Design a protein with these regions (language model features):
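Bacterial carbohydrate/catabolite-sensing allosteric modules
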Residues: 1-50, 56-159
């Protein structure tokens, strides 16, 4: 009997119905086809932002992941707003020595892929100031305590 060598990658995401997630879903499906691996999506419908009964129950979906069949796990970490849920996903994967990749958010216990927003924000603001002469620029950074929002706000203050 021949052993199946097709790799299987799990993807954990929350708030399933967003455009942000749709772009990743399409990219993962395309890459799976191109590089001959399978992808399993695990998702909560809400962003798990509030620590209410509904979110707690929904967050448990990730504990049902059969890590015995996975070769790796990818988290679209910024979609999963609850830090305890994030940590539990990593702990669940670590029990089976499954590598975890966190996209767009540094997360202990994972390899993190982080986008670099600072230089782009600096270029944008410098362009508005130097090339267009703007001196009073109103700025809305995004969510409070969000790593990238805080970085953008700091660049705004620096420039």
């Amino acid at each position: 009997m021949q052993e199946n060598t097709t790799k299987i990658i799990g993807v954990c995401v929350a708030d399933i119905s967003t455009d942000y997630n749709d772009r990743f879903f399409e990219a993962f499906k395309r890459l799976a086809h191109e590089f001959h691996f399978k992808v399993l999506f695990f998702s909560a419908f809400s962003p798990l932002y509030w620590d209410q009964k509904h979110d707690i129950g929904e967050g448990n979906i990730y504990q049902l992941i059969d890590t015995d069949v996975l070769d790796g796990l990818i988290m679209l970490t910024i979609t999963i707003k609850n830090e305890l849920v994030r940590k539990s996903i990593i702990e669940h994967a670590k029990k089976r020595h499954i590598p975890v990749i966190s996209i767009e958010y540094p997360l202990e216990g994972s390899l993190s892929i982080i986008y670099e927003y600072k230089s782009t924000m600096r270029k944008l603001l410098s362009h508005l100031i130097n090339d267009h002469g703007y001196r009073r620029i109103n700025f809305i950074a995004g969510q409070k305590d969000n790593l990238f929002s805080e970085e953008r706000l700091q660049v705004y203050r620096d420039v």
